[in-house]
Amino acid sequence: MEKQTVAVLGPGSWGTALSQVLNDNGHEVRIWGNLPEQINEINTHHTNKHYFKDVVLDENIIAYTDLAETLKDVDAILFVVPTKVTRLVAQQVAQTLDHKVIIMHASKGLEPDSHKRLSTILEEEIPEHLRSDIVVVSGPSHAXETIVRDLTLITAASKDLQTAQYVQELFSNHYFRLYTNTDVIGVETAGALKNIIAVGAGALHGLGFGDNAKAAIIARGLAEITRLGVALGANPLTYSGLSGVGDLIVTGTSIHSRNWRAGDALGRGESLADIEANMGMVIEGISTTRAAYELAQELGVYMPITQAIYQVIYHGTNIKDAIYDIMNNEFKAENEWS
């Protein structure tokens, strides 16, 4: 592939890690953010210490606060901003962009009030004459591992296979490999909903439960993620792939996962306010829990784990009581769909 110019919108942990992957592949990378001190740190010291204390970035990675300067003559734009501001940033891009580009996003969540997937938001806000079909970049990936060039395999999903293949080639190298998929709904819902299950898995750990319980919540969590995804039009096979069970395993079992750590703290009795303050990073599983719960209610999809976590987070239900309620649900066959 010829050298591409890519704007990475969002200098968080994942945006920074993906910027390094693109830079390693010989592309021109421009990171955009709205915190001048962070942008100055990246440009002056080539670090982003809020997320990576011991990592030095390549000096060719340049950061900007000016969106117009960031987007000038770019070939592709990668959104890696928090779910709640995706629409706002997309509107700003639409007002600034003056040529057609490849649009990608690597965030995982649902818009809190509309319950919409992020690709839908980007389609709504960025006119077709300025963009390709949206490409979702998602899968089992800790930024802390990717930034040190540990092996990572994820998915590029788009309704247009050729566009997904462009992104596959854009990112792939000896330590970072992408597979293509045309099931955008499946890949996006898997990436968003696994954060909820990770909160629950972390809570079980915080409460002192063992591996049996953790395996159960991952398996049963995958079942309800699949039910909701299929109700939205996803291919059920997607959930057995990298962006499905793969992402659920890495997020639902690891201390590197901020959603798992948030659940662990909840299980140990910390308040949500204290957890969010101490974390210093967005916990997408919290807002996604409400969106998924409300969407499941709207569609009539059975999601007992999501419902339990929703009750704990938003109504103050005792976690042990929520677990008791799940364990005392009516008996069902394992493969029962409702």
From Swiss-Prot:
Pathway in which this enzyme or protein is active: Membrane lipid metabolism; glycerophospholipid metabolism
Name of this protein: Glycerol-3-phosphate dehydrogenase [NAD(P)+]
Superkingdom in the source lineage: Bacteria
EC identifiers of the protein: 1.1.1.94
Disulfide bonds: none
Record field: catalytic activity: sn-glycerol 3-phosphate + NAD(+) = dihydroxyacetone phosphate + NADH + H(+); sn-glycerol 3-phosphate + NADP(+) = dihydroxyacetone phosphate + NADPH + H(+)
Stored PROSITE patterns: NAD_G3PDH
Record's function text: Catalyzes the reduction of the glycolytic intermediate dihydroxyacetone phosphate (DHAP) to sn-glycerol 3-phosphate (G3P), the key precursor for phospholipid synthesis.
InterPro entries: 6-PGluconate_DH-like_C_sf (IPR008927), 6PGD_dom2 (IPR013328), G3P_DH_NAD-dep (IPR006168), G3P_DH_NAD-dep_C (IPR006109), G3P_DH_NAD-dep_N (IPR011128), NAD(P)-bd_dom_sf (IPR036291)
The species this protein was found in: Streptococcus pneumoniae serotype 19F (strain G54)
Compartments reported by the entry: Cytoplasm
